[in-house]
Amino acid sequence: MLSYLTRLTGRDREEFYDDHLAHFLTFNAGAANAGGFMAFQRYTSHMTGIASASADALAIGEWQLFLAGLIAIIAFVSGAAFSAILINWGRRKNLHSQFAVPLLLESLLLAVFGFLGDWMQQFHAFYFPATALLLCFIMGLQNAMITKMSGARIRTTHITGMVTDIGIEIGKSLYWNRDPAYSTEHHVRGDRKKIRLLMNFVALFFLGGLAGGIGYNWSGFIATLFLATLLFLLAIMPVLQDIIRSNR
């Protein structure tokens, strides 16, 4: 188990471990996204909806809503940028934890959100922007980490690209390869393994959303601590490796 956790978020990457980690992170993104919606009626993991809502707000002269959306996008971009900085710094230092550190930071930020969420509700003017921006930053942090780790093969915080790729592969699978002018090596073939993988991600995002919604209704912000603990367990082994190595 310890070896598995070390390889899951460690420096040396294999497609097998990238895919396994993406399963955990997709569930986490779905849960955090749903929990955020239950808390303040906004989704924070996908920027498409936020950008569209900001454009609508600008069109009807709702400047506050427009600025809120713009700042949310900036928070997401900032999270992605900070993740890239951490990973590139870790690569420069040849750390085992170059990918684990952004996850560990995400874990700590989710824990802060879980512990302080109820307390922050008393500050109405501060509560919504602070929590929304924190979750947008967290989602940017996570999405950039798995994107860099997998060489842009996997993203976990939104499923638009996933269902698009599923449709593409289904279309390729259904293509009628009957043209005698083309040999079998040029036949169009769908990637069934990719379809299964992406369908798993979509299902886990949905299940994460279900768990996040139920968890928030049942226990409020404290439900976020489950996600924080999950990410902490995923990230801690490579970090401990680097700590032990630095003390030798």
Report each predicted region and the residues it spans.
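Alpha-helical transmembrane segments of multi-pass membrane proteins
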Residues: L2-R248
